[in-house]
């Protein structure tokens, strides 16, 4: 059963904070580029009506060689512009957006978000922090910090 949900995966960035000569989306996981691995993994979690991948303009044609299962859209020069470009191709009532760098999202998080989709205008996952958190020189109580 389709859920009236479009999945958008953002991978149009230049990976400037990544500080590596290869863009994040092209790092390999199990012999696949990260963007393909993450998108296929997320797609396997639910029956999305459509899956849209935002790509850098220079990489669009190459990405299309990997699969016909997704709609590829030219990303913008900011995350917000990439989202806007993708939204032009959405025909469903609901949209789920993920960044390609979120390769390890548990299926339970996706399921919980989809289960709650009709209960709010916008839903984001709020995850507990398990690492030590330091702000300036002070260790912060990790129970007071959340990952979004």
Language model: regions and residue ranges:
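Acidic metal-phosphate-binding loop of nucleotide-sugar-dependent transferases
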Residues: 79, 100-104
């Amino acid at each position: 059963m389709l859920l009236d949900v479009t999945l958008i995966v953002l991978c149009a960035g230049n990976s400037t904070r990544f500080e590596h000569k290869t863009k994040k989306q092209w790092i390999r996981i199990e012999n696949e580029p990260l963007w393909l691995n993450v998108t296929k993994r997320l797609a396997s979690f639910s029956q999305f009506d459509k899956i849209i991948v935002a790509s850098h303009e220079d990489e669009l044609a190459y990405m299309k060689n990997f699969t016909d299962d997704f709609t590829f859209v030219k990303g913008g020069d900011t995350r917000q512009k990439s989202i806007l470009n993708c939204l032009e191709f959405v025909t469903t009532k609901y949209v789920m957006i993920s960044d390609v760098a979120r390769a390890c999202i548990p299926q339970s998080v996706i399921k919980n978000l989809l289960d709650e989709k009709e209960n709010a205008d916008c839903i984001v996952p709020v995850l507990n922090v398990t690492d030590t958190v330091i702000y300036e020189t002070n260790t912060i109580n990790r129970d007071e910090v959340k990952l979004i």
